Amino acid sequence: MLGGSDLGNALAARPAEMVSVSPERWDLLDELHRGGLFRQEFLAAWQNGAAFLAARDGLRRRRPLVVEWRGGQRQPGDEPVPADLRIDHVFLVSCKYLSKIVSNSAPAAVFDRLLAGGHGGRAGDWYAHVAPDAYQALYRTVLDQLRSVPDGAETSAPTFGLGDSIDDATAGAADRVEAAGVAVGDLPASVHELSAADRALLKRRLGRGRWPLPLRRAADEFSLAVADSTAARWRRALATADQERVLWRLLRIGSAPYFVLGASDRGPMRLRIGTAWDWRQHFRIDRFAVTAAVRAQPVIEWRVVISNRRSADTTVVSGHVEVRWSHGKFAQPPEAKVYLDTPHHLIPGYWPLI
């Protein structure tokens, strides 16, 4: 993006135009580049920057004066643009490498507020709101299972899966400290009375990955109950809403255009994301459908049929929302991860960078 023909030299130069990159971050980038483990990621980012520098839609071979890194920061205000970079105070760029996640929000923000007012953080226990009986039944079954297993034993293999992220691999020590002094026999009879220490104990004892075999039937019934209730709640909210605006929020389309530079399993991803005004000039919604899915965790699938106003073409955009515990089973209130299942380059309103 800043020109030059060699990535190593560009890193060594630490260009002053990158105004928000600290010396410590430059040191880390140098170390990672020398290590070679992320060679493909560095190369893809370098090539995407070069493409944006040359693109007619982008910088048109004009070296930028200011490049600001905004990634990893929660943006203030009601802003749908997931911008990681801001170039010359004008160009907004989202960096998306091998990710289908559109947003990570509170379930109420997705299903009740329809993402109006921003994507928001997590608050409250969604499971307790939408499927209290199934939630309690699962917890009761978990208690019975744990009481049949010695306190020092884990109940599932340490593999990543339901309700977990890679961050949980480093969280074990903290969980053990928080759960210290709490035994299975001390756990309350009601899931609604769990303390932070109780939840840490459950997370540690249940482990990462799939549910233990004796708990899978109860977990499946719980997941379906949550998905059914959540889908019904979402449909009720959509029935009286402006569905076009809801779709724009799901697709992160707003009043400002921006660019997506990244990679998918199909190769480089270089897109220009139009505004809501652009979208309306070209497309309209024919149908917005929501269904509960039978999965190992609560999943709600969404499917939108879109017509092109300038032709007879129609496109189906599909995705799903996983409603899952944050950082492990029972650990923290659930979050809603919105996924886009349709490839980005096929989304109406996402145009190739030229």
Q: Each predicted region: which residue ranges?
A:
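Short, positively charged
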Residues: 1-83, 87-354
